[in-house]
């Protein structure tokens, strides 16, 4: 990633627009394959870093960006939400166009609107939806290789649905958090869990008020064990009750995970 110059300036065509600071609500889509996640890291390409570089190039050095979800390396987003603040008083369409002109092709700003008072992409969110994509074909589909986990067996979708039903509602999800997870409270409310099959492709959709680190990927890894026939459907509820990560299945690879949307009031 190119260096972000501290003296970056808005192009002359927009120079007169600098004035009172503004905050924008951005909706982004990205292919996370070649990025080291959302959060800025030294000497590594990240989504937040790409947005900051693009913003500082066209909007000035004081640009700030906050994402609703700090997606991990390799994770994608269909509709991620971010807050962007700047002293450039451009309109929302100009901000979107300026960012897309400077962002790499794997990252696009789908929309930009003036943020309502007090809006913060992360703190204002009421919940998120993720999808995990699985390719069960005997031969991995080349067009899906960057966005789906290849599991070349016929998975028992009915058994997976039965198992996942035990996770709906408010629970302690310690058994599905990263082994070296943070000290964040482990209780989450899962509002919806679905398994959708289209021929050799599966999508596991999970909506919740909040998620623990690796929570979706750990749930999927365990659900696939049930789909393979390696575990009983009842086992998933037992893993949940154990609150012990070592009792669950493997962590599914990052590249099959997609942030579908972020939910806000109104």
Regions found by a protein language model. Name each.
Residues 1-266:
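Structured-RNA-binding interfaces characteristic of tRNA pseudouridine synthases
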